[in-house]
């Protein structure tokens, strides 16, 4: 029942995203003629040095087990390197990094998983490049794909260093604002992690305390990198 409600919410929110883009502007001819380098320049200009927050919907598919999970919440990003993911559905969970340390807190279990942020957010995992967009050019081979949806530039990112957990990342970038509204990550097993963003707010004031975490008394603490 929860999955059905989450899936319904995802459909409604995706519809709102598309309607908002249709209403903004139809003058995409010039934008569609941009080169890959020009698109990357504009994306970097849009994100570099800026804080932002947005809502997200996540769909994770484990191919071998035929499992599809849905989740939603809010993301907060402070440049450079700081992120906070607040999952609200199907259950509350917080993922926080200050660029150095990582905390994952599950209130229902009173459990905290902690470790080194670079070990878990390297090479684009967890959409980490959103906190420092210039990492895209440094870490990936990038190509411009044909878009099935006329509102977006579709970018294909392949890690320069081969790895099993991330072999391919697809970015959907709006043609009018150069905002990343969809990230799809694939691994070598054919699993897919799709994140869609909406209601972006840029240049917001995000206190540094949002990106640190104080472990609650009595919490079960698990070291991820041991």
Task: Label every model-predicted segment.
Residues 14-25:
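Bacterial N-terminal signal peptides
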Residues 60, 77-79, 161, 175:
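Beta-strand elements of well-folded, non-transmembrane domains
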Residues 23-33:
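Bacterial Sec-dependent signal peptides at the C-terminal "C-region" and cleavage site
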Residues 74-124, 193-194:
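An acidic-aromatic
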Residues 2-16:
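Bacterial N-terminal signal peptides that target proteins for export
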Residues 135-225:
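Gly/Pro-enriched, hydrophobic low-complexity segments
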């Amino acid at each position: 029942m929860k999955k059905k409600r989450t899936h319904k919410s995802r459909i409604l929110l995706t519809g709102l995203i598309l309607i908002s883009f249709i209403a903004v502007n139809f003058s995409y001819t010039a934008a569609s003629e941009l080169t890959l380098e020009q698109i990357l320049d504009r994306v970097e200009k849009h994100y570099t040095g800026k804080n932002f927050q947005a809502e997200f919907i996540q769909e994770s598919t484990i191919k071998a087990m035929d499992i599809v999970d849905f989740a939603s919440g809010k993301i907060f990003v402070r440049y450079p390197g700081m992120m906070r993911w607040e999952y609200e559905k199907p259950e509350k969970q917080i993922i926080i990094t200050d660029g150095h340390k990582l905390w994952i807190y599950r209130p229902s279990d009173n459990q905290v998983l902690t470790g080194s942020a670079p070990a878990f957010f390297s090479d684009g995992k967890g959409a980490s490049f959103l906190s420092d967009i210039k990492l895209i050019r440094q870490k990936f081979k990038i190509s411009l794909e044909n878009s099935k949806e006329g509102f977006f530039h579709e970018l294909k990112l392949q890690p320069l260093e081969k790895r099993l957990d991330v072999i391919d990342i697809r970015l959907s970038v709006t043609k009018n604002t150069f905002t990343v509204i969809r990230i799809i990550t694939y691994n070598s097993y054919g699993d897919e992690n799709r994140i869609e963003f909406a209601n972006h707010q840029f240049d917001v004031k995000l206190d540094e305390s949002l990106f640190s975490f104080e472990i609650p008394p009595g919490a079960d603490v698990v070291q991820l990198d041991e």
